[in-house]
């Protein structure tokens, strides 16, 4: 009887030791796995040093306008224009019979030039009693599309003013050597040239842009990106990027917004998608869009949030900051 009791006691102790050893081994293994995971995985913070943007080739509407306005930007350099006009006006020499040219030259040099705004250079086309000592140097724009430049208009205005001064001086109505007369004419010409220089087209920001970026030190896999985009209704198409059409599944319907790779050249090569990875995606919508801009923007925002949730990323605004309620209101004000 005593042997049976001793046997049960030993069996119970053995079972307790085995259970304790199993629990201790499982706890140690679990602790080791979690310790390695947290030590190797970087903190989940958004990427702040993104330098890429929507490739110009993927924005055909604004790309042509930017190329066409490149020449006008070079031609309307305010500092260069102002310096040329000031030097040209100081070098005007008017000779009338019976008048000392040296005395008049000193008065012209003392005459102030009104330059509150950039003034356009002068190119007179006649030779009466007005002579230029030097020919001002002009910068030819790389692209010229305007039929009549502001420089030609300002030149015509200044030529008419000088001709009017000569006519009045010949009739004795005004003293052409009077400092007050010269100041009045120069101020009048400067004001007219300023009004011409201010007539410049203002480019409007006609694109809504949102970013989906991976956490710091991580990237999105290409096959996951394609799978998530197709699940959200995107279709692979023109420019080798994905588009969201007005009617889901109908590629013939108008495109509402698109998504491109954030890294240059911004495309998705489906033949190498298994080896593809990226730090982020850019979603953009042109304004005005097909249909209602507010409704399309809300659809874009909802799609962006769903995409970020599916990929485990973050949504950034056009300034590459975390998209918050202030960003939402700012975007809604733009599309309203």
From Swiss-Prot:
Residue ranges, compositional bias (Polar residues): 59-70
Single biological process term from Gene Ontology: FtsZ-dependent cytokinesis
Residue intervals passing through the bilayer: 3-23
Coiled coil (residue ranges): none
Main location as per UniProt: membrane
NCBIfam families associated with the record: septum_zipA
Name of this chain's protein: Cell division protein ZipA
Summary of the function given for this chain in its UniProt record: Essential cell division protein that stabilizes the FtsZ protofilaments by cross-linking them and that serves as a cytoplasmic membrane anchor for the Z ring. Also required for the recruitment to the septal ring of downstream cell division proteins.
Pfam families named among the record's database cross-references: ZipA_C (PF04354)
Keywords: Cell cycle, Cell division, Cell inner membrane, Cell membrane, Membrane, Transmembrane, Transmembrane helix
Region (Disordered): 57-76
Cytoplasmic-side positions: 24-336
The gene coding this protein: zipA
GO cellular component, one term: plasma membrane
Sequence similarity: Belongs to the ZipA family.
Topology Periplasmic: residue spans: 1-2
Disulfide topology: none
Subunit organization: Interacts with FtsZ via their C-terminal domains.
Annotated membrane topology: Single-pass type I membrane protein
Subcellular location(s) per record: Cell inner membrane
Taxonomic classification: Bacteria, Pseudomonadati, Pseudomonadota, Gammaproteobacteria, Pasteurellales
